[in-house]
Amino acid sequence: MAFRTKQDQVAEILRERIIAGTYPRGTKLKQSQIAEELGVSITPVREALHTLEAEGYVAGVSHKGLLVPEVVPGAATEVFELRVLLERELTARAVAAMTPRDIVGLRESQARIVALTGSGTEQDMRAENYRFHFRLYELANRPQTLQFVRVLWAKYPFIGQEYVGRREKQLAEHERFLALLEAGDAEGAVQALVDHIESGWAGMQAGGPTEVEAASEPRPKRRVIRA
């Protein structure tokens, strides 16, 4: 496993929180609060936020500081099309390079998502879904493409939203992908992952988000950054 600096670790935790909706769109991110929650100094938090600003996960707003940005109207379709294009490529390369141990790792991530359906929050599930996808994409060993995909996830309108019936369907789609992977059907597995992305997009367009009560959402869990 590649060495990850404190800045890298903080950035990844913040990405997960934004994707999960722990920090809803419009939330102001305070460096001191994040540093205290993660048990680090201000410096890696500041550097991580600079990285996330470049990726589009946060945006600097005059007199307000760094906020989780709102969705750009009309951009969702283009973002979806780019996701399909790039994530298909990453998945194909990841599947070609995958070892049995990698498949076990994805299975473990899927098991955590399943466990969270009964005991976890929506934020927990969305964060674990993010880990599942990027655990897969990192196996492609295409860091520049991976970076573009991170940017696209930041711009996608699903951040912080849950769509009617999506939870069960997501689990079934992950399961289909894994089953094809374990059966040695590389082409089928890649198409299953693409179908999964397209299914999420179709559900978002057809069903719309269910109501999420921001006031009832738990505070971010304290995470400890390793030196």
Tell what function each PLM region has.
Residues A54-A59, A154, R166-E168:
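Mobile beta-alpha loop/short-helix "lid" or hinge segments that flank ligand
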